[in-house]
């Protein structure tokens, strides 16, 4: 904050006032806080004790790395956590003061609660007395009721996320997995008009700077300098916007004067692996002078906008450079003559000058149709950027191209392959760029055939808006050509979610078969029930840990080439089989899998890469548990993009056509799992640079995952009867075709294993009842010291939850009748019959609770810290979980 004087009306956001001093409200900077010590560490961030420099007030600062959130596909959850805390004003919910961010991190500035978390206190106590447990549960119940009334579901309720205030009261925190029904960004009115208590205290009022920080947008396109090494998802996330393709801009007026082609590219575009950044010297990067002679003629604009777009330069820098500051080689007479001659050129395309213009525009102009060599929409500049320049053209060759003589161009064009070695070397003038001094760079040959050949090898900028094989593999196409009509945003990398303990949904399918007595109302909610397996094999889903993004090396491409032809012989039979399977039940789709981790090596493109296939650099992304749930999704999408040919081996065909196992037939009402495959796919199967095929040896072992059907519609469709014309049609997502009931709105499994509600494990739609289930688990844990469904492995925990296997204490440790009854109504399998706040208030266990004055009641435990910076009460949980929080790395 600062005091400014408004002198003119042109100072941006400062209006004209009569020489009066006033303070402009603005959020603070993270530099205004100094770190005292680390407090704790969670699955997605670290919490530090920090002090405000101007008033020495203590805060708890949660630091979340943007790159980690991008890699774990948790960007939306960070936004939800900030929104949930900003909307909440309750004495039982931790108060959020500021939401700040830097280039790499997001900082949530919250109140510091010195009493630690309830999990640490529980480790010290062993278990709580009934009176103590009832008070804690009562305060948490009020907090949950407040959240639910405001459209917020916590979804990660556990003792670790309950903090103890200085007076001993409970406050909920860690809304990282919460669900907020607000379908838009926060506005100022959302925060200012948030209802709290009947008589709100001043503690819940927010300053203008706090409000501005809480409604600010969180940006996740980190700058190039802030990238962490070894993370590929950060690079691809920066390319999801406009980094890979220049911004398409239409002319609003037909007037030529006063309109320029603006090409935008964020700074994150520097992460593109195909961009010739290394070819640019610091001098060229500093000047960034466009080759522009006049804006009155569209043909005379031979600019560096495309090159700047490839190099990740922001358009806001374009006006910072002047011709006078350019180095000598950019102001040389040869460059100016080249530009002016190209601008004055009105000759036919056969002339040498026009050839120079044509070739130069191949490198620079984003408005050249490379299929015809003609410019589209040049008369009134109303055309779109239908094609973008090749990313494989180096900056050296581009600059050198401007220095070519017309005679050299003609001679270079007429030379054959045998005579190319006799090319005349370009005379280097004193004004030439410094990289031409050694003469080691040979001139780039602008041969149309070579350009087209390159387009078949790699998906470059030139191919973003059209089918990759339109010019290369036209003879192999049997169906309609396609043209991308709009930019399709990338699908998330993963459909499973990064959790407090990340949960793989693949091995949950075995557990669902054992819940017939408790889940009779789920006839169409589950996608697939696999054959039952033994307890030893319950965790076999964990074998699907092979990251699909790691299969983009040359060996896998060669393997894909070898396997791409293995299913061609029984093509028609497999088509008929797929069509028949679309009418079959889920039993006909039952396939077991034991070695899918080894077999998935043949998949060399992931779902993420199918969204923007010009990103070959994702081969090094580390394996994450979130990608386990994507195994069948990638295989399914590979089937979808395989046109007019069979990819399923004969063994898989036999399995699909054979009668189902007895266990699968026991569920005739299950919704069938059907795989989508389009026979008029725009991707040609033989093009190895495009999404490749699954190994023919591994397709008979595909494991159909339950959690892989949420985002991509699946259906078996017959081959097209008619061959469409040659008109280009846009890519379109297949229409959603479902059998049975609607799928759950969000099938991501959220939470910590011990506290997950059954409907989450069953893949059903869920609501606030999941929090009341978790509250019942917490009540049992408070009274016994151990969660009711705790076991050695997550799969066994899920088995206990679905079977509702509660180990009640016996003999002298037996719980009271009222306590056991309260736990029973909170842990009801049927979420419609699960208890809520109204039921708890009427229950005998809570008869002594004064609900309206609960925040003023004395609490059984009051923290006694040594000083205001004492974090001892957090250490018990950290030690129990073997967490070391001595590091200060952000």
From Swiss-Prot:
Stretches for region Disordered: 324-353, 412-434, 517-541, 559-592, 609-628
Top-level class of the enzyme under EC nomenclature: transferase
Gene Ontology cellular-component annotations: centrosome; cleavage furrow; cytoplasm; nucleus
Alphabetical list of SUPFAM superfamilies matching this protein: Protein kinase-like (PK-like)
InterPro entries given in the database record: AGC-kinase_C, Kinase-like_dom_sf, MASTL_STKc, Prot_kinase_dom, Ser/Thr_kinase_AS, Ser_Thr_kinase_AGC
Binding site for ATP: 39-47, 62
Residue numbers carrying Phosphothreonine: 752
A single GO molecular function term of this UniProt record: protein serine kinase activity
Entry's localization field: Cytoplasm, Cytoskeleton, Microtubule organizing center, Centrosome; Nucleus
Top-rank taxon: Eukaryota
GO BP term (any one): G2/M transition of mitotic cell cycle
Domain Protein kinase per the UniProt entry, residue ranges: 33-846
Biased composition (Acidic residues): 615-624
Catalytic activity: L-seryl-[protein] + ATP = O-phospho-L-seryl-[protein] + ADP + H(+); L-threonyl-[protein] + ATP = O-phospho-L-threonyl-[protein] + ADP + H(+)
Enzyme Commission numbers on file: 2.7.11.1
UniProt keyword annotations, A-Z: ATP-binding, Cell cycle, Cell division, Cytoplasm, Cytoskeleton, Kinase, Mitosis, Nucleotide-binding, Nucleus, Phosphoprotein, Serine/threonine-protein kinase, Transferase
Protein name according to UniProt: Serine/threonine-protein kinase greatwall
Organism encoding this protein: Xenopus tropicalis (Western clawed frog)
